[in-house]
Amino acid sequence: MKKVRVTVSDFMFEILKGDSEYFKIPLGKIGNTLFKYFIDKNLSKIELEESSGKKVQFNLSKENEDIFFDVLREKKADTEAELMRDIFFTYINNLRFKREEIIFNNTFKQIREAIKNNIKIGIKYHSTARIINPYFIEVSSKENRAYLFCYCEKNEDFRNYRISDIENIWNLQKEIYIKNKEYIEAIKKNFDPFLSYGNFIKVKMTEEGKVLYERVTQNRPKLVKEEGIYIHLNVVRN
């Protein structure tokens, strides 16, 4: 089993480490996924002193090990470390939602293909198998990550599922069931991860509560009007 060792800048390392934690994927798996993804794509070049920065090392998968040196020659990289550093550099020069799409490229492809062909898919999500009718993929601007909006037959309701949390996916040769087309369009136009569109609650806040509300930057309920304070009700559903 071949081990890859590469020095990256502190900035690059923090992004790679952050994505590993955010998407709950080991850094080695990210390295193998990126190597395979960028085989047929142009790479951005970066020069870095080998003595500076942080070390990243991981074992290549058997599939990647078999083609590693062919790719090294194809990319005209002088060293193994240079090749992987250029791959990492090309990867981090994307916003997080795009990096998510790179890491989970196969999942995105299968979902989009199912939507295009109007067919149902099966997914394993939070350790539970579900049959779903996929409608669209949307990026949450507050979280900078992608969700699949669908109708879940297990729950008999509409759901948003984080694409990065889909553990397995398979196609079903059954036509999508379009349930409540107007609602689907309304959600697409007023998207939020918690499907809070049309749900409102009235909250009376203390001054300390208002300060805490203003500090929240992610998934903060939208302020509708203030007489006290009115906010959208966000309900997390699995």
Segments (PLM) and residue ranges:
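Surface-exposed, Lys/Arg-rich phosphate-binding patches that contact polyanionic backbones
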Residues: S9-K29, K62-E82, D86
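A short, Trp-centered hydrophobic/proline-enriched beta-strand micro-motif
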Residues: E113-Y125
